[in-house]
Amino acid sequence: MKRIGVLTSGGDSPGMNAAVRAVVRKAIYHNVEVYGIYNGYSGLINGKIEKLEIGSVGDIIHRGGTKLYTARCPEFKTVEGREKGIENLKKFGIEGLVVIGGDGSFMGAKKLTELGFPCVGVPGTIDNDIPGTDFTIGFDTALNTVIDAIDKIRDTATSHERTYVVEVMGRHAGDIALWSGLAGGAESILIPEADYDMDEIIARLRRGHERGKKHSIIIVAEGVGSGVEFGKRIEEETSLETRVSVLGHIQRGGSPSAFDRVLASRLGAYAVELLLEGKGGRCVGIQSNELVHHDILDILDKKHTVDQNMYRLSQELSI
């Protein structure tokens, strides 16, 4: 294999640039040419492809977002769209593709694999919801962004003796909520993977207030429901002054943490190794700090699960 491509797809995550950098530099180290595909699968269809050199990825390891840009691409879900994408890959002489993104991006890589084009997926999403890896690129940075926000919210919550509901990202996965809630000392954590008892949450807030607690923090993953609605109900049933903070897209931005930069560098380089070994249709990950790879079809068939021991601990510590 003498020429490979790389693209970023779906929602951006901090560390994607570090992964792109690793792909480019690792490939060039092995005398393999690298082509960047801009705007994800949309750029693949539209032919927005250009050769990348070492200088192309200079000064990006510390930058959030993605140099290659990203976009949703409904057209790629069609057979015609995918065939057009492969046609463009062949036009540039590209023999393998590294896809950096989440489960939707992996689905695109799966479709290309089924058409006979070798792809390797690199998990890049702040949600940490890709099976087969302990961590995804961007999760640690997003987690630290949320923790920083919680710490600041706690300051004002204490000053005004208020209860705060903090809504974080996670439509189907509660890792951001769970990890940030545990690290931030939240009184309650609501995640999509676990049932919750609103009456118990209310009772817990009342108990805290009765023993002189000056503030409370409730973390809600967006997939559970609206933080605003939770805030209204809490205030109505407890008479505690309650405010809601929806963190939104700030969780996706910012300079990647050291952990995410190292993770992205390791996974990006490993993806290139697999392609050069002729192993397409794979996705890479890290488990117990060891690099691993899986059949991308198997990963897409699995469902993300939350760490039940960690969730249980969060419940035990929020008495």
From Swiss-Prot:
Mg(2+) binds at residue 103. Signal peptide: none annotated. Pathway: Carbohydrate degradation; glycolysis; D-glyceraldehyde 3-phosphate and glycerone phosphate from D-glucose: step 3/4. Disulfide bonds: none annotated. It is found in: Cytoplasm. ADP binds at residues 21-25, 154, 185-187, 211, 213-215. GO terms for biological process: canonical glycolysis; fructose 1,6-bisphosphate metabolic process; fructose 6-phosphate metabolic process. The keyword Kinase applies. GO terms for molecular function: 6-phosphofructokinase activity; AMP binding; ATP binding; fructose-6-phosphate binding; identical protein binding; metal ion binding; monosaccharide binding. Its cofactor is Mg(2+). InterPro entries: ATP_PFK, ATP_PFK_prok-type, PFKA_ATP_prok, Phosphofructokinase_CS, Phosphofructokinase_dom, PKF_sf. Its EC number is 2.7.1.11. Keywords: Allosteric enzyme, ATP-binding, Cytoplasm, Glycolysis, Kinase, Magnesium, Metal-binding, Nucleotide-binding, Transferase. ATP binds at residues 11, 72-73, 102-105. The keyword Transferase applies. The active site is at residue 127. GO terms for cellular component: 6-phosphofructokinase complex. It is an enzyme of class 2 (transferase). NCBIfam families: PFKA_ATP (TIGR02482), PRK03202.1 (NF002872). Belongs to the phosphofructokinase type A (PFKA) family. ATP-dependent PFK group I subfamily. Prokaryotic clade 'B1' sub-subfamily. Catalyzes the phosphorylation of D-fructose 6-phosphate to fructose 1,6-bisphosphate by ATP, the first committing step of glycolysis. Homotetramer. This is ATP-dependent 6-phosphofructokinase. The gene is pfkA.
